[in-house]
């Protein structure tokens, strides 16, 4: 799942 808040992947 892409974390669009930080740009990193949300694990």
Swiss-Prot record:
Chain positions found as Sulfotyrosine: 4
Entry keyword annotation includes Secreted: yes
High-level lineage: Eukaryota, Metazoa, Chordata, Craniata, Vertebrata
Tissue expr: Expressed by the skin dorsal glands.
BP GO terms, sorted: defense response; regulation of blood pressure
Role, per record: Hypotensive neuropeptide.
Superkingdom field: Eukaryota
Principal subcellular localisation of the protein: secreted
Protein name as catalogued: Caerulein-3.1/3.1Y4
Keyword list, A-Z: Amidation, Amphibian defense peptide, Hypotensive agent, Pyrrolidone carboxylic acid, Secreted, Sulfation
Residues bearing the modification Pyrrolidone carboxylic acid: 1
Transmembrane parts of this sequence: none
Location in or out of the cell: Secreted
PTM-bearing positions, type Phenylalanine amide: 11
Family note: Belongs to the gastrin/cholecystokinin family.
PTM info: Isoform 3.1Y4 differs from isoform 3.1 in not being sulfated.
Coiled-coil stretches: none
Gene Ontology cellular-component annotations: extracellular region
